[in-house]
Amino acid sequence: MAAGKSARKVIMKERNTTLETTDHNNRNNSENIKETPDERIPGKLIGAIVAVGSLAFIGILTETVMTVLFPQLMREFNVNTATVQWITTIYLLTVAATMPLSSYLNRKFKHRVLFLAAVALAVLGSLTMIFGHAFPVILVARIIQGIGSGVATPLMMNIILEQSPRSKVGRLMGVGSLVITVAPAIGPTVGGAVSSILPWRAIFVIVIPVI
């Protein structure tokens, strides 16, 4: 009987300890839940995301803008359809080759350095598009732009993942994905509207101040 009472006391003590621990954990969880909605996205972070997102948006936009310019480019450079398509193909290949390096670049360089490099490449590529008067030069310009876009797009996602409050990551990733999906959708419309009233090089003249 004494042994049975002792066992019951031990069991009751363990239960009380478990209940106290559970209650303590629940209070901590409740406090954490209350704190989460109060997390704010720093203004500096918003500025960084807008800046890098705009750069990525322009890079993706110019990729689809070029498709509606093919007839003009074929006439100006005297090339056929198969050749003029390399303007888009070489850009996409360059972006695809650059993006896998984003993890390495992110470890080696600060976000600011990568952003400035992407801006410099975007401006250089656009200037080359404006002043290039030979088809090979245009292809080189697209390679330069592709490297810039290949750096900017993953950089936007890295900034969101590394610097955003945990409760806001999903929302900001959604905004980042929106940038990537909207840009190619409106590219042909923008390209057609601009090229209908201005020379095709005007697109890149407009892009440079935005960058």
Model-derived features: where do they sit?
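Short, intrinsically disordered terminal tails adjacent to the first/last structured region
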Residues: M1-I33
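Transmembrane-helix bundle of Major Facilitator Superfamily
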Residues: E20-I211
